[in-house]
């Protein structure tokens, strides 16, 4: 990713996080953290990865609510970030934190069953 793309992605991440915290009042949007943003080379498309705390149903509901708010969020981005074109945004669920927790739990389970043989 080019330096400009990285800067734009960071700016989008910062602004969307701020909007989620201060401006969106949808009760379906729970504990959301924007983990990363990927921007296309031409800066016209942005995939926004969000980590959602809660059950799988809560996660799905939150992502759906974010998708419904895409128009508002994109409009606000256009006002806050000076670009020739405001990127089309897509929200995606980032499951890497959940996977990492699962891997750590499995490693702990193996360590307990193995009786600490490699210590």
From Swiss-Prot:
Job of this protein: One of several proteins that assist in the late maturation steps of the functional core of the 30S ribosomal subunit. Associates with free 30S ribosomal subunits (but not with 30S subunits that are part of 70S ribosomes or polysomes). Required for efficient processing of 16S rRNA. May interact with the 5'-terminal helix region of 16S rRNA.
Listed GO CC annotations: cytosol
Gene Ontology biological process terms in this record: maturation of SSU-rRNA
Superkingdom of source: Bacteria
Subunit structure: Monomer. Binds 30S ribosomal subunits, but not 50S ribosomal subunits or 70S ribosomes.
Keyword presence, Cytoplasm: yes
Pfam families registered for this protein in UniProt: RBFA
Gene: rbfA
Keyword Metal-binding found: no
Localization of this protein: Cytoplasm
Keywords, alphabetical: Cytoplasm, Ribosome biogenesis
InterPro entries in the cross-refs: KH_dom-like_a/b, RbfA, RbfA_dom_sf, Ribosome-bd_factorA_CS
Primary residence: cytoplasm
Annotated SUPFAM superfamilies: Ribosome-binding factor A, RbfA
Coiled coil: none
Gene3D superfamilies xref list: 3.30.300.20
GO molecular function: ribosomal small subunit binding
Name listed for the protein in its UniProt record: Ribosome-binding factor A
Taxonomic lineage of the native organism: Bacteria, Bacillati, Bacillota, Clostridia, Eubacteriales
Similarity remark: Belongs to the RbfA family.
